[in-house]
């Protein structure tokens, strides 16, 4: 079976594709899987690391406001359909899967027009524009939240699968990996990250907290995002006796190990992040991005908060004092953390990749 997976831009679009690819390989070792993205997305790093070939086309989003940049983006979009057509002709996939990002538009559309079985996966409760446009052309739409149903017209194409997460998250043990991370024993581990691209407000707040409040109460792995790493890491000034407890990194590649060892997460509220927290049962302080369509991250965050698995801090309310006090109020109360962990896990889905695999086999 030849499989082409289109997805890119952020980890939230790429990691579900990697999870699907890994499951396919487990079921069919001889499966030939290729990814397609753009040259500017995180896929250029994540996909090769997992051993899959990556093809690229040129496409990006654009605003409706007329400008030179918009005209260039429209030109690239038109060209991307021809690039996608040539790619499909060369690879000859048996099925094409879209997991999000602008690259899905031309690739999935051209595949459907060529009669190739197609499937898109929508990770959010509020679907993106590209997936809503593709609905009429593809064979199936795999959705992760029941709330997403109302945004699609053809209900017969919808299948509730949940978000596929990496198998490593399901099969790891804390004791086995904690020592590999070099964390100080006897102290809880906090993991803070603002998504694959980083989040300026979160980064600056955590740097402020480390400089002015932190007294070695916990271990911290702080992922800034590659674009902001040099700037943020240079501002962090930690007392020498606490330096072994803090690791400032641009990106967490071994995130499965970090998840397993963590006691509390500080992060955005993207759909894939929420699903991974649920699978792992990790309590969290969620800071939803205010810069996303229809404010869908706050909806995600409030859902987990209602379940009792998370504390939500809006970005416009975020400051170092508030964050520090919230962290301490949780990590020094093990009963609260234990209850939050249980509440986080109660709506977890662990067989999403399997469900998507069965859809693939149905349409080819």
UniProtKB/Swiss-Prot annotation:
Subcellular location field: Cell membrane
Chief location: membrane
Family annotation (PANTHER family): GLYCOSYLTRANSFERASE, UDP-N-ACETYLGLUCOSAMINE--N-ACETYLMURAMYL-(PENTAPEPTIDE) PYROPHOSPHORYL-UNDECAPRENOL N-ACETYLGLUCOSAMINE TRANSFERASE 1
Keyword Zinc-finger listed: no
EC number(s) given by UniProt: 2.4.1.227
NCBIfam families named among the record's database cross-references: murG
Name of the protein in its database record: UDP-N-acetylglucosamine--N-acetylmuramyl-(pentapeptide) pyrophosphoryl-undecaprenol N-acetylglucosamine transferase
Positions that bind UDP-N-acetyl-alpha-D-glucosamine: 10-12, 124, 166, 196, 252, 297
One CC-aspect GO term: plasma membrane
InterPro entries: GlcNAc_MurG (IPR006009), Glyco_trans_28_C (IPR007235), GlycoTrans_28_N (IPR004276)
Record-level GO BP terms: carbohydrate metabolic process; cell division; cell wall organization; lipid glycosylation; peptidoglycan biosynthetic process; regulation of cell shape
Gene3D superfamilies, per database record: Glycogen Phosphorylase B
GO molecular function, one term: UDP-N-acetyl-D-glucosamine:N-acetylmuramoyl-L-alanyl-D-glutamyl-meso-2,6-diaminopimelyl-D-alanyl-D-alanine-diphosphoundecaprenol 4-beta-N-acetylglucosaminlytransferase activity
Function: Cell wall formation. Catalyzes the transfer of a GlcNAc subunit on undecaprenyl-pyrophosphoryl-MurNAc-pentapeptide (lipid intermediate I) to form undecaprenyl-pyrophosphoryl-MurNAc-(pentapeptide)GlcNAc (lipid intermediate II).
Membrane topology: Peripheral membrane protein
HAMAP family tied to this protein: MurG (MF_00033)
Enzyme class: transferase
Pathway: Cell wall biogenesis; peptidoglycan biosynthesis
Family: Belongs to the glycosyltransferase 28 family. MurG subfamily.
Reaction(s) the record says it catalyses: di-trans,octa-cis-undecaprenyl diphospho-N-acetyl-alpha-D-muramoyl-L-alanyl-D-glutamyl-meso-2,6-diaminopimeloyl-D-alanyl-D-alanine + UDP-N-acetyl-alpha-D-glucosamine = di-trans,octa-cis-undecaprenyl diphospho-[N-acetyl-alpha-D-glucosaminyl-(1->4)]-N-acetyl-alpha-D-muramoyl-L-alanyl-D-glutamyl-meso-2,6-diaminopimeloyl-D-alanyl-D-alanine + UDP + H(+)
UniProt keyword annotations, A-Z: Cell cycle, Cell division, Cell membrane, Cell shape, Cell wall biogenesis/degradation, Glycosyltransferase, Membrane, Peptidoglycan synthesis, Transferase
């Amino acid at each position: 079976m030849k499989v082409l997976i289109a997805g890119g831009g952020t980890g939230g679009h790429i990691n579900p594709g990697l999870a699907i690819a890994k499951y396919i390989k487990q079921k069919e070792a001889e499966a030939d899987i290729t990814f397609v993205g753009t040259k500017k997305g995180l896929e250029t790093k994540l996909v090769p690391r997992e051993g899959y070939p990556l093809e690229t086309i040129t496409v990006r989003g654009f605003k409706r406001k007329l400008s030179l940049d918009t005209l260039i983006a429209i030109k690239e979009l038109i060209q991307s359909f021809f690039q996608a057509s040539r790619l499909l002709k060369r690879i000859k996939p048996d099925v094409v899967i879209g997991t999000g990002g602008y690259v899905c538009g031309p690739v999935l559309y051209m595949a459907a027009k060529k009669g190739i079985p197609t499937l898109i996966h929508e990770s959010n409760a509020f679907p993106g524009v590209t997936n809503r446009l593709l609905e009429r052309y593809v064979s199936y739409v795999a959705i992760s939240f029941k709330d997403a149903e109302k945004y699609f017209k053809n209900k017969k194409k919808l299948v509730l699968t949940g978000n596929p997460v990496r198998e490593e998250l399901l099969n790891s043990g804390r004791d086995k990996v904690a020592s590999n991370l070099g964390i100080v024993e006897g102290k809880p581990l906090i993991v803070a990250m603002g998504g694959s691209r980083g989040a300026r407000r979160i980064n600056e707040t955590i740097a402020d907290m480390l400089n002015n409040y932190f007294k070695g109460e916990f271990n911290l792995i702080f992922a800034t995002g590659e674009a902001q790493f040099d700037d943020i890491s240079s501002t962090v000034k930690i007392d020498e006796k606490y330096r072994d407890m803090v690791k400032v990194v641009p990106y967490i590649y071994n995130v499965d190990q970090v998840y397993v060892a963590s006691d509390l997460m500080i992060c955005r509220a993207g759909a894939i992040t929420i699903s991974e927290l649920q699978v792992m049962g990790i309590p969290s302080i969620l800071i939803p991005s205010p810069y996303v369509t229809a404010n869908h991250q706050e909806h995600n965050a409030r859902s987990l908060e209602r379940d009792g698995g998370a504390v939500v801090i809006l970005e416009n309310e975020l400051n170092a004092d508030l964050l520090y006090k919230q962290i301490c109020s949780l990590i020094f109360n093990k009963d609260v953390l234990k209850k939050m962990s249980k509440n986080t896990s109660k709506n977890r889905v662990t067989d999403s990749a399997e469900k998507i695999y069965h859809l693939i086999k149905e349409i080819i």
